[in-house]
Structure formats: C-alpha cells, structure tokens
C-alpha cells in the first residue's frame, strides 16, 4: 500500500504544471483609433513587421534592434514579477522573440510615466552589468541596460535571469501600450546580446519536469487564455496532438504542405515555411498570395489601412485550410475575420519574408486561437490540436 502511495506521489510530481493566466485586452491599434491618433501614428511610423524576423545587429556596441510596432495588434498579456520582493509587470509572451525587457526607474520618457517601472534598489537580488541594449521601432528606440534578477512566472522562481531595463522609450508608441514589456519564448540562437531566454533558464535550473511549454488562447473577451510551463493540459483541446518537426531552431519554424480554399490551392502549393508566433496577432504571408486571399474573401482597404469585409458576408465565406505534416487545419471565417465595434476586418496581412527556403508565413493568434499549441524544446517539434 505504501508503494502504491509512493508511486502515486511520484506520478503526481511528474505532472506538475505552472500556468500563467493571460488576459485579453484592447489592442494598441484599437486604442489609438478610438483616440483619433491612429492615422497620425501610421504616417509617422512606416510599419514593417518583417523587421521582427530580420533585425539589424550592431555587435561591437551590444546594441540590438527589434521593431516594437509588431506588437501594435497584440491583445493577450500576462503578469510576471521581477526582483525580491517581486515587482509586477504586464508582458507579451512572445514565441517570436527571445529576450525579456521591462521599463525601469531610470526611464524618464513619457511612455514610462504610466507603466510599471523596475527599481533595482528595491530588489535585494538584483545584479547589474555594463552591457546595454537598444530596441528600435522606426523613428525612435527603447534603450537600456542589462541586469540579472529573480523572475516569478506562474509560480516558478527563475533565479539569475538576465533581462533588459529601459532607460528611454518612444512615447508616441508605448505611451498607450497595454503592456509594460516583452517576454520572449523563441530559441536562444536569436536572443539579442546572447541573453539566456526565460524558458531556457527555467529548464536549466530543473524547475520544470518537461522541456516544453504550451499555449491556449481563448476567444473570450476577458479571460481563459493561458501559457503552461513544463506540461500539457488535455482539457484545453479535443482529439490528439499532431506533432510537426521544427525545421530551423531559431523561431518556431515548421513546414506547411499547402493552403487551400474550397479544395483549391490558393498559396503554398508546393510547400512553404511558417513560424508559429504568439507575438503576432494576424495570419501573414507573402504579399502576392495574401492579396489574392483578400480579393477572394471580398476585402477592401479602408481609410485606416485595414482590409475590411462586409459583416453580412461572413457566414457565406469558406474555411481556409492549412495542411501541416499531412493534417488539415481549417481556419473558419469566424476566426479569420475580426469583428470589433461594427467593423469586420480581415485577419490576413501581407509581408514579404524571403529566406533560403522561400517566403515565410506567420501563424499568429488568428491561427493559435483555433489550435492548442505545444512548443516542445526537448524534441524540437510543435504539437497542434483543435481547442476544446
């Protein structure tokens, strides 16, 4: 009997998962639009989401660039704590980048005045460095320093974690941002300044039993979304997980067999590469096939630059099917048409990302909301299953 109890306790210990609740908030684009600031912002900032995946590096000064405008449409955010005692921050959990950064008390920019700021002097475990970091986004940049401290993530105490502390931030962009900073969950090979990503540090310290994390994004306007570190919760999906090999260990890059509509190939007919990215809200692809998709679904550009469709037409639009590793993943019009305050906006975006293996597609939140996603570092694979 004692052995049975012991085995039960061991099994239970191996299934411990750490969950970080994500809250769905109003995106920065929507906030700017409601305040009548979006048109002016778009005029001043030449948005180029592709720069997220091809940053410009200046190694001699340890300055790294990563465009912040990629987070213009983000809606899902979680809370972490940094320091001892912990100071709380709202961050984007981003599988399309690898660094952690938050505002600091050294920042006097307007954007920092209405966000949480980390104070190293209030933390007994903070360790400073002489390294600097700069994250650019067009006409301005976030500059700061790198330091080490304990990061609290969903009940995990991640000690000796390197992160960026901002000293200047571009007010015209970040002042209205619904988040304080970014927590990257991609591979360490794309980490700026060679900083160890949060999940790598967690795994290296033996703080989780499985070298993987998983994501569930709820369509609910408020709650229900979650990032799970070190485990998989089958209550969030139906059927079985289908596993897809990672083709390049940088971003979470996989092969897509084809993209079809009404049984006909509309893109990626001979296969293509895609990145599964929680830090991108839309489904993006090369401008030419995306333009064809927009035409097929009857989308046209409005004065804000959004591709809009008639809300009454949604029920008659077809699914768009992504075939991945031989399995079909339909995305229905209720998912790829985003409805907000009487407007219906296409969830597709054109973006050219040329690589040696061809143009990249980005499977952002529009896709991930439909499919529970496991990011398996141990086996370098992505698991997908329909959400429950």
Curated annotation (Swiss-Prot):
Main subcellular localisation: secreted
Class of this enzyme: hydrolase
Localization of this protein: Secreted
Molecular function in Gene Ontology: aspartic-type endopeptidase activity
Residues annotated as the enzyme's active site: 94, 277
Catalytic activities: Preferential cleavage: hydrophobic, preferably aromatic, residues in P1 and P1' positions. Cleaves 1-Phe-|-Val-2, 4-Gln-|-His-5, 13-Glu-|-Ala-14, 14-Ala-|-Leu-15, 15-Leu-|-Tyr-16, 16-Tyr-|-Leu-17, 23-Gly-|-Phe-24, 24-Phe-|-Phe-25 and 25-Phe-|-Tyr-26 bonds in the B chain of insulin
EC id: 3.4.23.1
Keyword Thylakoid: no
Protein's UniProt keywords contain Nucleotidyltransferase: no
Alphabetical list of Pfam families matching this protein: A1_Propeptide, Asp
InterPro entries xrefs: Aspartic_peptidase_A1 (IPR001461), Aspartic_peptidase_AS (IPR001969), Aspartic_peptidase_N (IPR012848), Pepsin_A (IPR034162), PEPTIDASE_A1 (IPR033121), Peptidase_aspartic_dom_sf (IPR021109)
A biological-process GO annotation: digestion
Modified residues (Phosphoserine): 130
Disulfide bonding pattern of the chain: 107-112, 268-272, 311-344
All residue ranges annotated as the Peptidase A1 domain in the record: 76-385
CDD domains registered for this protein in UniProt: pepsin_A
Function: Shows particularly broad specificity; although bonds involving phenylalanine and leucine are preferred, many others are also cleaved to some extent.
Family: Belongs to the peptidase A1 family.
Official protein name in the record: Pepsin A-4
Gene that this sequence comes from: PGA4
